Design a protein with these regions (language model features):
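Bacterial N-terminal signal peptides that target proteins for export
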Residues: 1-8
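Bacterial N-terminal signal peptides
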Residues: 9-16
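Sec/Tat signal peptide C-region and signal peptidase I cleavage site
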Residues: 18-22
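Short N-terminal segments immediately surrounding and downstream of signal-peptide cleavage
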Residues: 23-38
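Peptidyl-prolyl cis-trans isomerase
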Residues: 25-26, 58-214
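Short, solvent-exposed loop/turn elements at domain surfaces
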Residues: 39-40, 163
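Short, surface-exposed, low-complexity cationic segments
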Residues: 44-58
Length: 214
């Protein structure tokens, strides 16, 4: 479900960090969710993170929708007293993020362009892990993958891609575990999408974004 991107609720942390660094922020409320509020600084902070990770940002309206989704997941996880990731898990997540860039130089350059510190990034990764781990825990047991689904994915995706690259595809048995997990993750995303849609319909939400930002 674009979990690179439920881009999980680091925006308030970044907004607070920006204020403590003395940056000039003109803040205003852009949404009310139940008894909580979402600020323009949170939308801006998530946009900076998207710029860092993807090299581009969504519209403020789409970012606000993501923040509302994050609120839903975070509220559920906090209510369930779901455990936060360990320091080792966070460090591993930061390492994986760094490895997703072509080079250390590109990572540092994009980090600087986005105005993020190492502490910002660690906070982002920690919260992203917290929320994605919660969704995994909540929905994994409901996802069942039939053997034929694995075989179909192998033929339609793995074999087709290998042929397009003029490469020999890996054996099905060697790919089975990877394919199984990919299909489980897709199922979790689908379950989470449905749950979020149902949850949003029950929420009291008021948005105050200007028309041009939607």
């Amino acid at each position: 479900m674009r979990w690179k991107t439920i881009l999980l609720s680091i925006a308030p942390l970044l907004a607070a960090e920006a204020l403590t660094r003395g940056q000039e922020l003109i803040d205003r409320m852009v949404a009310r969710v139940e008894n909580d509020i979402i600020l323009q600084s949170e939308v801006s902070a998530l946009g900076h993170y998207q710029q860092f990770v993807d090299g581009k940002t969504e519209s403020d309206g789409k970012i606000l929708d993501r923040l509302i989704d994050q609120w839903i997941v975070r509220n559920e996880a906090d209510t369930a007293r779901f455990p936060h990731p360990s320091d080792a898990e966070v460090a591993h997540g930061v390492g994986r993020l760094q490895a997703s860039f072509a080079s250390t130089e590109e990572y540092e350059s994009r980090k600087k362009q986005a105005g993020l510190s190492d502490l910002d990034i660690r906070a982002m990764v920690a919260m992203q892990l917290y929320l994605s781990n919660y969704l995994n825990s909540r929905f994994r047991s409901a996802v069942q993958i039939a053997p034929k689904e694995v075989e179909d994915f192998y033929q339609d995706a793995v074999v087709t891609r290998a042929k397009a690259r003029n490469q020999a595809p890996p054996a099905l048995d060697a790919s089975r575990e990877y394919i199984q997990e990919a299909l489980v993750q897709r199922g979790i995303n689908e379950q989470a999408d449905r749950w979020l849609k149902e949850s949003r319909a029950r929420l009291r939400v008021a948005k105050f974004l200007s028309e041009g930002a939607k």
